[in-house]
């Protein structure tokens, strides 16, 4: 294909436009006073055209960082204007709209990958053309601006002449059909490079058509002259004609410009130099331009380092500018010593063409903010970056500031990306030069205004969300800024550190704030159970075994204020009216002695570490151990074991602060033994012995003293300094322990009922009577607890005791009386009659069932009637709700089913089932005490083989998930604390997942591909690693060495790929997904009761989800208003950019998105919904072109956004009446103007 003629009209029009662009670079860099003076020197017609064109080119000039100030010499700008006039540009100037359609679109984008090869090949072509034209003579016109009559006007057919445009008539400005070179919409620029005329040797003849390397016998062709009737200059123009035209400028300017011979691009070999050749002079004189180029900032290299332009006389004025659509690059001359620009060294072969590399340092942190689904979870060592940020920047990239020393080849080597992103979002006007690598920054102009606005916004958010005090403190710490002089340090987020320390230690962060409380009414017990149950639902601990220890029980009542524990972060959550107080506060003295001189040292950190796990503290106080090796030999009979379970259930979460034993040597040894066996679980409490030989607890609980007189009347001596309780006059076990000597070491195996201690007038409660009747009916001849221990040992030697057989169903008689007896024995345990229990230890080997109840005992002190069902007496008329059998066999949690049934039912929660329960096993759910019913459902004893059906793992994630899914009734919610299932459920479920985008690493031998989409990963493997040309293929996937035929190899590869999936980590859920987006949707709709939006943590009271929080709709589509996972492409691979490379944004760049969003007093959910409307979807940063699939709803907004690097899309100014999006977000690019996409 023949090379295009550089003397053609299209080529010269292009060069004229580039000269005008060079003029605008100097004009844009001039200050305002210089621009005003230039306006006074230019005629009105030309000035109007220049200003209209400048308005279009100004965004591009701003994107090139051409700042005001470097050019103060008006003579330089005037000289450039004269050169434009001398070329005849204003005779038929192209429409200024063409710049916005072609020139800007090509200059601001990357070129094609083969440009460098074309540049080298084209340089050789120019050398050949220059050599061949040295011997050629061209007749040119003389300086009187009249065409030379000796010029041959006939078209020349020579291969070296302009055979196409030699006889063309002058262009008509009004007719675009006669001027195809000016119709930029239809013009396709040549995909070749043109050497600037300024770099042609001065002794060469006029520019001629390039000689194609394939053309032979060039010597046989004779070159004719090139006349001046080409381009847009008419052949009949005279000096008087030009001076009479207002648009061409004053006669003085024209005449002064025509007095400089010797600088024309067209010269002859004769001594006569045509003065009119200055009309086509493409380079300014050395005398006038040298000094101005040293101060020019039109090029980034010259702006950064002016010393590089020492040889500016030989520099290319169009250096660094090239077209993308035409692949035409204006390269510097062969003799130029100027450095190559970033366009020449940028490795465009490795950059994905649809991904924009134009990213300014001012918006680095903001791009990180918008490239993540939850920006607060990005790690400093591995942030989730925008794909555009994967372009590696070298050292000294920025103009100034502290960041440039930290760019060691990659942006991800920067110090703290979390702080950078948060600082950028809080201070939109903060320039990048004020940021420092450690996350600190220097004060800027609007620092105080933005600090005040952020504080005001934060307080409004706290009031709207009704956050707990700890959450408020955490938010204020995250948004705080410490100022030291001019340096500002954002306060560190200590939430993660506190969570890590709390999860690894047994601190007070997880203890319930409680107070020592005593009551004599059943109503008090009901309130106690209700408040304590709220805490039990939050805990998830391992199953525990019991060794009974005798101790006087002081009832620990949780505070009536709202409190709950976040089991994920192990942080105590409270409402605003609650003050945290641990169960075991510091003692009055640093060291106090236990009985017989057992020292106990108190340390705040140790106390916090011990009191975090309340279950373990209670276990240590009761002698409960988690392993069989640590458990001492059993010395209890069946009866006492059953009683021990009741005490465990009622006091497992309570701290036993005093005991009944006398200070005998045996009891002291027992206390020492407990501390020796499990020192980590024994609370460091402070005991003292008074004159009555009563061991009291001196631990300071730092809680207010109960105001009720009945509560304080139980204290025997009225000593308010110690939380001591004397032995009551009557005890349920007084018949079994007639004297104090009987309360020896074995007395630790006896539990004192909480109800019996707190019951007024020593009245035996129904629970106590049940236990006592069972006790007396089992063995009426028992005299002491030592005899009971011997009977327990015999029962253990003989195998499984009666109670264990009764529970496991191994020794159930076939007659009706045996079944009724077994059901009667099990009913108190399952239905919650004994007490509000968290765990029921069935046998030594049978696992623990975690369950919960929401009901209170009837507020009455009178005795309830009993049904005589053998030896066990159970209160009458207790109603039970039986869960459906189909629900039993399902895998969904119990709370989900109850939620579907209705919100007025009580809930069993925290039950982890690994296998399906038998359909014949109904489970009874207790209702409120006020809802009496005559129905009483029985429990089928045949289905009680819990060894096969119930998992031993109680600490599974499903327990925490199902714990707070209950939808409580209004009546049940009144005495309970407020549950926040949003934070409780969502954070637990989503903390299990990997954050960010998925990564799929190719396991093929020698392949290092790492993709972020399973679809792209499958394409990569099937296309790259499946050689279809071979008949037999060997599999090199990981350790697979199979050799298969080519037609079977694809199915074999797909078998490997099917194993790469994202599995749902929720227990009993076996679904797998190919990307995080589908997995999130699965969790939202299958395992969570509401939508997951990480930006808004709204209080959900009583399980009722607010509709506006659940569904946030989009103005253009029907999608939810959440941020989706849009990392759907592979990361582009890019080599390091040159040292002088600088990121250039597209026209209309503006980085103050958050500042605009927060200017109006919008609520938090509205801001998030507004972000969802602004193209933050899969077309983020130009991930695919406009021909990709559109949205499901059929709208084209997602695919038709103008993005940098996409061909064929131009931005045109339109009137405000045209309905266009008011704000477009293209990754880090924000365009505020009304635009129209074509």
UniProtKB/Swiss-Prot annotation:
Region (Disordered): 133-156, 196-237, 277-303, 546-568, 696-735, 784-824
Composition skew (Low complexity), residue ranges: 224-237, 702-723
Amino acid composition bias (Polar residues), ranges on this chain: 214-223, 291-303, 810-819
Predominant localisation class: nucleus
Compartment list: Nucleus; Chromosome, Centromere; Chromosome, Telomere
Biological source species: Schizosaccharomyces pombe (strain 972 / ATCC 24843)
Keywords carried by this UniProt record: Centromere, Chromatin regulator, Chromosome, Metal-binding, Nucleus, Telomere, Zinc, Zinc-finger
A GO cellular-component term linked to this record: mating-type region heterochromatin
Composition skew (Basic and acidic residues), residue ranges: 785-796
GO-annotated biological processes: chromatin organization; pericentric heterochromatin formation; rDNA heterochromatin formation; silent mating-type cassette heterochromatin formation; subtelomeric heterochromatin formation
Entry GO MF terms: zinc ion binding
SMART domains: ZnF_C2H2
The keyword Kinase appears for this protein: no
Protein name: Cryptic loci regulator protein 1
Domain of life: Eukaryota
Subunit structure: Interacts with clr3.
Function: Regulates silencing of the mat2 and mat3 loci. Organizes the chromatin structure of the mating-type region where it also participates in establishing the 'cold spot' for recombination. Required for proper positioning of nucleosomes at heterochromatic loci and for transcriptional gene silencing (TGS) function of the Snf2/Hdac-containing repressor complex (SHREC).
C2H2-type zinc finger locations on the chain: 1062-1087
């Amino acid at each position: 294909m023949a090379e295009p003629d550089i003397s053609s009209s299209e080529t010269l029009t292009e060069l004229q436009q580039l000269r005008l662009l060079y003029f605008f670079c100097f004009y844009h860099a001039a200050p305002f006073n210089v621009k005003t003076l230039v306006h006074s020197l230019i005629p009105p017609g030309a000035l109007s055209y220049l200003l209209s064109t400048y308005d279009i080119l100004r965004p591009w000039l701003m994107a090139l960082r051409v700042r005001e100030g470097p050019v103060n010499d008006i003579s330089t700008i005037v000289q450039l204007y004269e050169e434009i006039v001398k070329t005849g540009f204003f005779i038929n100037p192209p429409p200024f709209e063409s710049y916005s359609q072609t020139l800007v679109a090509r200059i601001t984008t990357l070129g094609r990958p083969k440009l460098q090869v074309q540049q080298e090949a084209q340089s050789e072509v120019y050398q050949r053309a220059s050599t061949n034209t040295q011997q050629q003579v061209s007749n040119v016109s003389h300086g009187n601006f009249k065409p030379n009559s000796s010029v041959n006007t006939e078209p020349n057919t020579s291969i070296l002449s302009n055979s196409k445009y030699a006889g063309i008539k002058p262009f008509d400005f009004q007719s675009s059909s006669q001027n195809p070179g000016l119709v930029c919409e239809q013009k396709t620029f040549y995909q070749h490079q043109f050497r600037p005329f300024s770099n042609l040797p001065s002794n060469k003849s006029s520019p001629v058509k390039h000689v194609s390397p394939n053309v032979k016998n060039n010597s046989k062709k004779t070159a004719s002259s090139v006349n001046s009737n080409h381009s847009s200059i008419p052949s009949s123009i005279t000096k008087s004609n030009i001076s009479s035209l207002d648009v061409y400028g004053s006669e003085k300017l024209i005449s002064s410009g025509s007095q400089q011979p010797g600088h024309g691009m067209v010269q002859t070999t004769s001594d006569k130099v045509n003065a009119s050749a200055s009309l086509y002079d493409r380079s300014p004189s050395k005398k006038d331009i040298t000094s101005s180029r040293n101060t020019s900032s039109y090029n980034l290299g010259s702006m950064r380092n002016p010393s590089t332009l020492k040889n500016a006389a030989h520099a290319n004025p169009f250096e660094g500018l090239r077209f993308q659509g035409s692949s035409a690059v204006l390269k510097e001359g062969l003799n130029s010593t100027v450095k190559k620009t970033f366009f020449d060294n940028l490795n465009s072969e490795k950059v994905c063409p649809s991904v924009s590399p134009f990213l300014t340092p001012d918006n680095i942190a903001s791009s990180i903010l918008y490239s993540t689904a939850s920006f607060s979870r990005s790690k400093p060592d591995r942030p989730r970056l925008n794909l555009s940020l994967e372009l590696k920047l070298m050292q000294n990239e920025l103009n100034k500031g502290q960041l440039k020393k930290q760019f060691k080849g990659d942006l991800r080597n920067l110090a703290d990306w979390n702080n950078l992103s948060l600082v950028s979002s809080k201070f939109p006007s903060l320039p990048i030069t004020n940021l420092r690598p450690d996350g600190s920054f220097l004060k800027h102009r609007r620092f105080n205004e933005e600090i005040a606005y952020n504080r005001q916004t934060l307080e409004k958010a706290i009031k709207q969300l009704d956050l707990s005090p700890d959450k408020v403190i955490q938010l204020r710490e995250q948004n705080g800024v410490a100022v030291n002089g001019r340096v500002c340090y954002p306060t560190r987020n200590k939430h993660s550190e506190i969570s890590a320390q709390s999860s690894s230690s047994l601190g007070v962060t997880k203890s319930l704030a409680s107070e020592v409380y005593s009551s004599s009414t059943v109503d008090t017990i009901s309130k106690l159970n209700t408040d304590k149950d709220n805490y039990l639902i939050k805990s998830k601990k391992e199953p525990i075994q019991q060794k009974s220890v005798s101790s006087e029980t002081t009832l620990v009542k949780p505070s009536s204020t709202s409190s709950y524990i976040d089991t994920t972060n192990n942080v105590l959550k409270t409402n605003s009216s609650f003050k945290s107080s641990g169960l075991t506060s510091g003692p009055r003295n640093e060291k106090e002695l236990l009985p017989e001189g057992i020292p106990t040292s108190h340390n705040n950190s140790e106390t916090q570490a011990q009191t975090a796990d309340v279950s373990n503290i209670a276990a240590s106080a009761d002698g409960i151990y988690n392993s069989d090796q640590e458990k001492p030999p059993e010395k209890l009979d069946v009866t006492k074991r059953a009683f021990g379970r009741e005490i465990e259930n009622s006091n497992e979460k309570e701290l036993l602060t005093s005991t009944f034993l006398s200070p005998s040597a045996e009891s002291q040894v027992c206390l020492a033994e407990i501390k020796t066996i499990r020192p980590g679980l024994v609370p460091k409490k402070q005991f003292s012995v008074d004159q009555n030989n009563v061991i009291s607890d001196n631990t300071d609980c730092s809680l207010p003293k109960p105001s009720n007189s009945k509560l304080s009347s139980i204290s025997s001596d009225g000593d308010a300094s110690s939380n001591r309780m004397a032995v009551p006059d009557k005890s349920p076990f007084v018949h079994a322990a007639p004297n104090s000597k009987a309360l020896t070491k074995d007395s630790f195996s006896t539990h004192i009922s909480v109800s019996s201690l707190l019951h007024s007038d020593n009245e035996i409660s129904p629970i106590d009577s049940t236990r006592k009747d069972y006790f007396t009916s089992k063995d009426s001849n028992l005299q002491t607890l030592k005899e009971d221990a011997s009977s327990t040992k015999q029962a253990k030697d003989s195998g499984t005791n009666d109670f264990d057989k009764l529970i496991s169903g191994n020794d159930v008689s076939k007659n009706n009386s045996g079944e009724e007896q077994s059901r009667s024995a099990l009913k108190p345990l399952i239905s919650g009659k004994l007490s509000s229990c968290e765990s029921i230890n069935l046998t030594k080997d049978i696992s623990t069932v975690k369950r919960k109840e929401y009901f209170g005992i009837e507020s009455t002190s009178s005795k309830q009637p009993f049904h005589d069902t053998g030896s066990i007496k159970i209160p009458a008329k207790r109603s039970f709700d039986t869960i459906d059998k189909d629900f039993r066999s399902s895998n969904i949690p119990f709370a989900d089913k109850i939620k579907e049934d209705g919100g007025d039912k009580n809930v069993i929660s925290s039950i982890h089932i690994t296998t399906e329960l038998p359909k014949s096993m109904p489970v009874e759910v207790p209702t409120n005490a006020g809802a009496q019913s005559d129905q009483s459902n029985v429990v089928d004893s045949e289905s009680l083989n819990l060894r096969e059906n119930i998992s031993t793992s109680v600490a599974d994630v499903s327990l925490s998930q199902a714990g707070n899914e209950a939808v409580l009734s209004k009546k049940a919610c009144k005495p309970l604390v407020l549950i926040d299932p949003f934070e409780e459920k969502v954070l637990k479920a989503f903390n299990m997942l990997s954050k960010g985008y998925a990564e799929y690493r190719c396991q093929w031998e020698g392949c290092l591909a790492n993709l972020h989409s399973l679809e792209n990963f499958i394409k990569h493997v099937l296309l790259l690693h499946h050689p279809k040309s071979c008949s037999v293929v060997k599999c090199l996937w990981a350790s697979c060495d199979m050799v298969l035929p080519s037609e079977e190899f694809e199915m074999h590869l797909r078998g490997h790929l099917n194993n790469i999936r994202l599995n749902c980590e929720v227990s009993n859920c076996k679904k797998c997904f190919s990307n995080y987006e589908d997995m999130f949707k699965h969790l939202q709709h299958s395992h969570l009761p509401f939508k997951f939006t990480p930006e808004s943590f709204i209080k959900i009271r009583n399980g009722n989800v607010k509709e506006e929080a659940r569904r946030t709709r989009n103005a253009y589509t029907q999608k939810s208003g959440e941020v989706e996972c849009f990392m759907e492409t592979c990361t582009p691979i890019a080599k390091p950019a040159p040292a002088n490379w600088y990121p250039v944004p597209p026209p209309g760049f503006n980085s103050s998105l958050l500042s605009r969003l927060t200017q109006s007093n919008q609520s938090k959910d509205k801001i998030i919904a507004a972000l969802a409307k602004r193209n933050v979807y899969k077309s983020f940063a130009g991930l695919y072109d406009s021909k990709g699939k559109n949205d499901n709803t059929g709208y084209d907004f997602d695919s038709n956004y103008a993005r940098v690097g996409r061909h064929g899309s131009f931005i045109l100014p339109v009137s405000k009446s045209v309905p266009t999006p008011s704000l477009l977000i293209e990754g880090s690019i924000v365009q505020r103007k009304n635009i129209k996409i074509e």
